[in-house]
Amino acid sequence: MAIVSGIEIPNNKIGLIALTYIFGIGISTSKRIFKDTGIDENIKVINWSDEDINKIRKYISSNIRIEGELRFEIQLDIKRMIEIGCYRGIRHRIGLPVRGQKTKNNCRTRKGKKKTVANKKKKINK
């Protein structure tokens, strides 16, 4: 397995798909990496030469934020939104969906498990 930026990339995949195993690299970024480095994106990882791997490593380390650095940046952005009290920050703080989804029936991922509320017993008047 080739190791790029501390992540093991599967050998049996083509290069375009294999790079998407790294957090922060999707299909479009992967295509841009192969275009800028001049490597064929349809070659399987097992057939990459050491020179190809080094080109990809250098390009990623100098041009793209990935893994821990990207996660930290996202975390700081969320903290900043919470501190300034914008709408998205408030939604993050109270644990509701941030991007405009309806919350009457769904959004269980953000709200957590259902909390059952006990009903009050009705008094019978005679």
From Swiss-Prot:
This is Small ribosomal subunit protein uS13. It comes from Karelsulcia muelleri (strain GWSS). Residues 101-126 are annotated as: Disordered. InterPro entries: Rbsml_uS13_C (IPR027437), Ribosomal_uS13 (IPR001892), Ribosomal_uS13-like_H2TH (IPR010979), Ribosomal_uS13_bac-type (IPR019980), Ribosomal_uS13_CS (IPR018269). Located at the top of the head of the 30S subunit, it contacts several helices of the 16S rRNA. In the 70S ribosome it contacts the 23S rRNA (bridge B1a) and protein L5 of the 50S subunit (bridge B1b), connecting the 2 subunits; these bridges are implicated in subunit movement. Contacts the tRNAs in the A and P-sites. SUPFAM superfamilies: S13-like H2TH domain. Keywords: Ribonucleoprotein, Ribosomal protein, RNA-binding, rRNA-binding, tRNA-binding. Belongs to the universal ribosomal protein uS13 family. GO terms for cellular component: cytosol; small ribosomal subunit. The keyword Ribosomal protein applies. GO terms for biological process: translation. GO terms for molecular function: rRNA binding; structural constituent of ribosome; tRNA binding. Part of the 30S ribosomal subunit. Forms a loose heterodimer with protein S19. Forms two bridges to the 50S subunit in the 70S ribosome.
